[in-house]
Amino acid sequence: MNFQNTNKPSKVVLSVGDESGIGPEIILKALYSNEIPENIEYILVGSKKNLQNTYENLRSLGLENLANPKNLKIQDIEICPSNNDPKSSYGDSSFQYLKKAIEIVKQYPNAALVTGPICKKSWSLAGHYFSGQTEVLAKSCGVKNVGMLFTA
């Protein structure tokens, strides 16, 4: 996919992952970057409240290079409050974020999906028995052979 040579904004949908984990922090740091092309539209899927709380907590620790959630397009799905306990509610939240992100990506033929980290134990506690996000994508898209790319 060539983001640089298009007249329309390309869409990148970001599922924030487990909101009690590092996903929200990673996304807020990444979207602050001045290296992001202007013709890309980012759509975050997650809890607007949690992203705002993460932003405020990180700012209170002295971190400045963060995207302000108030300036981001967020598909708000408020399922549970955030803490650092791998409860089933957090597993269900991250699973629902991924399902919604997949739904959005399917609407746009040139869209990309970025997934934040999840807690597989929380998914299991919530009754979502997939070995990972790649398998959810495969099932949602009706394919048998899948692959995953991890980059940092």
Describe the role of every protein-language-model region.
Residues 1-140:
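Contiguous, glycine/small-aliphatic-enriched amphipathic segments in soluble metabolic enzymes
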Residues 149-152:
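Ligand-binding beta-strand-loop-alpha-helix segment within the catalytic cores
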Residues 146:
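A structural signal for short loop-to-beta-strand junctions that line the ligand-binding cleft
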